[in-house]
């Protein structure tokens, strides 16, 4: 797999160009990452990211503008070090913690398992059931309930249910221990 110097893979990513070199992408930006849009008047939009310094140019087709009037009233924080997840909701002038739970983040086991990426993302897609395959095959391995895709192949989801089981699993004793997901 092709990746940049920060380890961000080209697959399902956005090319980031330096303002002085628009022929070859210098880095890759994560799909779904929240960025600051500085100028959208040309084919290449000028942006700033939270994880790299400076300004970057990105093809406009990869940028979904969010109006200044849009506010976020829900947030999810994933602690990859301590294997926890917290959900918050903005109510009035306060952010309320709605839940704090043990979680299992992504493990490094290429080519199928990837670490949970760090960053600030906007949810790209929601699925009641995310069907997954057995690694390296086209055989259905099971499903993960309540899946929200935030970047590339990264999802926040409920406890995976391996086939042939069909009923939901509410809790797993491995949650909050070590990175196990992919």
State what each model feature region is.
Residues 1-39:
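Beta-loop motif signature
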Residues 26-64:
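SH3/SH3-like beta-barrel superfamily modules
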Residues 40, 59-167:
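Gly/Pro-biased beta-strand-loop elements
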Residues 148, 179-182:
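Active-site nucleophilic cysteine motif
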Residues 2-5, 162-178:
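Surface-exposed intrinsically disordered loops and tails
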Residues 11-13, 44, 82-84:
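Exposed beta-strand and adjacent loop surfaces of beta-rich binding modules
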């Amino acid at each position: 797999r092709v990746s940049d110097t920060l380890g961000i893979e080209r697959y399902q990513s956005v090319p980031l160009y330096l303002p002085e070199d628009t022929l070859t992408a210098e880095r890759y930006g994560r799909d779904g990452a929240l960025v600051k849009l500085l100028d959208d008047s040309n084919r290449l939009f000028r942006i700033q990211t939270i994880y790299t310094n400076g300004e970057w140019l990105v093809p406009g087709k990869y940028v979904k503008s969010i109006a200044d009037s849009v506010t976020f009233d829900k947030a999810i924080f994933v602690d990859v070090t301590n294997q926890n997840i917290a959900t918050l909701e903005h109510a009035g002038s306060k952010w309320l913690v709605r839940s704090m739970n043990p979680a299992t983040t992504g493990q490094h086991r290429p080519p199928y398992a990837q670490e949970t990426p760090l960053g600030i993302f906007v949810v790209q897609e929601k699925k009641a059931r995310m069907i997954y395959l057995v690694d390296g095959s086209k055989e259905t391995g099971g499903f993960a309930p309540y899946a929200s895709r935030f970047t590339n192949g990264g999802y926040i989801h409920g406890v995976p249910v391996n086939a042939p089981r069909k009923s939901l699993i509410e809790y797993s004793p491995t949650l909050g221990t070590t990175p196990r997901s992919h």
